[in-house]
């Protein structure tokens, strides 16, 4: 890099002698000592070239270069750079071009910029040396303002209908991005994803506690739809610490709730349940009826995954009643959809389907593709169990089709489980294996081991139907082991039942012994009947 910059300077001034060039480099080396202990010749050469190139910049470009060293993340766009500088975006783009032309900044993609690590260190050192302390403190605040308000604008598209925080206006020199549509918001979120954690970390390190908790709260809904829940958890933990530091109990409950949702997204149900329990306790203490209903609903989602069906049904019913009383149609609809899932899991299909169809109509009316896809997944499962495999296939395929618009791998991976099951039942084993394989890959990347295990389980059942017993057993054993490790006794029992060995069936019966719903009773009867048939064959 140093040779490239020096060579370009030499070419741009062919009348300059080599001795003059070397003298200039040496003279400009004094201001920066970050790269060398003084006896490292290579580092010293790089340092002096950086200094020389920096000193050749116009003052406004040099100032931008310095301030960019204070950006918290690895890459940035012109709007974030403008916020750091407190300058108009159009002028900032011109200055960025100047820095790229001087090889002090790289441009890996259109409207994206990054430093070489050594240049970042140099820029940061120059900011410390040449910028007044007030300017060094104001620039990071401005860029954090920009992230907060742009993320807030993005979540309006990414989580329509969700609750938005009241925010103070940004610094007058900050121009947040406005989005025309969903895809623009997703594009921004995906580009900036790697900056979210560093931004919140920078806010925490600077003692900007209000920025810290608000950024964390807003970024839950503004994160890229296909982001891993594990990526957000450290963001949420920092926000939670900031809320506690402020003694802001509503903010603490909100962050606790979202940390719980993050744990659930990666299959950590015990941690999720504890977070929702704490959020519920705070909201009860505050007398926040809507918040209590929200925490109750989320707590019961975890109970549902743990198959505590009676408790989940009772609590979902309570939450739905509160939301309805408060005129909150969207969360009331979510609670009703969750009730339909409870009834399906209990084997009460005649109750589950009418609720699911009503929610489907509501989501279609509102144009809520995420909600629609989720309820279509449930309807597909109901159709499959009631002997309508072709209908189940069409329904699951529609759900996955909606994901293409949403660009959400979390939803795609989940809905592919329903599509794979329908494809297998409809006599399309090859297609089913493709769906389960992609679901497994997506869930592995997202860090959701429980759903990854469900994809293995689905593949194992397809292989079993094809008579490829060795491959079936390998997938099913792997799935059963993962479910056991995660404490998911119901799905472990299903995997063991599919394996079909006498020891497997006995273990499955033990696992589902606590369940008293119609589905569990029917499965126990099936397991016992299979055991009797096996004994008669002997």
PLM regions with names:
Residues 200, 240-241, 277-288, 318-327, ...:
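Amphipathic alpha-helical segments of tetratricopeptide repeats
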């Amino acid at each position: 890099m140093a040779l490239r910059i020096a060579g370009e300077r030499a070419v741009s001034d062919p009348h300059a002698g080599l001795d003059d060039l070397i003298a200039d480099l040496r003279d400009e080396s004094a201001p920066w000592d970050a790269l060398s202990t003084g006896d490292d010749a290579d580092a010293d050469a790089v340092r002096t070239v950086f200094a020389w190139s920096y000193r050749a910049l116009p003052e406004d470009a040099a100032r931008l270069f310095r301030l960019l060293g204070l950006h918290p993340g690895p890459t940035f766009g012109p709007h974030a750079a403008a916020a750091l500088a407190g300058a108009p975006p159009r002028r900032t783009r011109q200055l960025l071009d100047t820095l790229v032309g001087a090889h002090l900044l790289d441009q890996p993609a259109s409207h994206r910029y990054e430093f070489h690590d050594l240049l970042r260190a140099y820029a940061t050192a120059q900011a410390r040396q040449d910028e007044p302390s007030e300017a060094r403190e104001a620039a990071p605040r401005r860029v954090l303002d920009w992230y907060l308000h742009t993320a807030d604008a993005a979540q309006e598209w990414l989580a329509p209908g969700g609750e938005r925080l009241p925010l103070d206006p940004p610094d007058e020199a900050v121009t947040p991005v406005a989005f025309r549509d969903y895809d623009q918001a997703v594009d921004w979120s995906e580009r900036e994803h790697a900056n979210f954690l560093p931004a919140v970390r920078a806010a925490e390190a600077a003692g900007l506690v209000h920025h810290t908790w608000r950024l964390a709260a807003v970024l839950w809904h503004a994160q890229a739809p296909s982001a891993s829940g594990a990526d957000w958890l450290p963001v949420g933990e920092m926000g939670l610490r900031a809320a506690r530091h402020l003694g802001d109990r509503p903010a603490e409950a909100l962050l606790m709730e979202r940390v719980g949702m993050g744990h659930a997204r990666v299959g950590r149900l015990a941690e999720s349940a504890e977070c929702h329990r704490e959020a519920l306790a705070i909201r009860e203490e505050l007398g926040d009826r809507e918040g209590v209903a929200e925490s109750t609903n989320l707590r019961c989602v975890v109970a549902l995954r743990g198959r505590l069906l009676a408790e989940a049904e009772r609590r979902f019913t309570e939450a739905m009643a509160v939301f309805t009383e408060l005129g909150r149609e969207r969360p009331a609809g979510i609670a009703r959809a969750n009730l339909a899932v409870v009834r399906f899991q209990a084997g009460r299909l005649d109750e589950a389907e009418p609720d699911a169809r009503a929610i489907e109509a509501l989501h279609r009316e509102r144009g809520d593709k995420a909600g629609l896809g989720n309820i279509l997944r449930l309807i597909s499962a109901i159709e499959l169990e009631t002997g309508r495999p072709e209908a189940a296939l069409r329904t699951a395929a529609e759900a996955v089709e909606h994901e293409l618009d949403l660009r959400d791998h979390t939803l795609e991976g989940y809905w592919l489980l329903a599509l794979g099951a329908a494809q297998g039942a409809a006599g399309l084993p090859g297609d089913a294996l493709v769906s389960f394989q992609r679901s497994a890959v997506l869930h592995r990347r997202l860090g959701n081991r429980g759903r990854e295990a469900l994809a293995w389980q689905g593949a194992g059942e397809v292989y079993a139907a094809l008579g490829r017993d060795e491959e079936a057993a390998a997938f099913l054993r792997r799935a059963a082991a993962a479910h056991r490790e995660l404490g998911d006794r119901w799905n472990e029992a299903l995997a063991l039942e599919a394996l079909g060995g006498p020891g497997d069936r006995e273990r499955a019966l033990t696992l589902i012994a606590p369940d008293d719903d119609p589905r569990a009773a029917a499965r126990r009867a099936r397991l016992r009947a299979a055991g009797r048939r096996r004994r008669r064959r002997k």
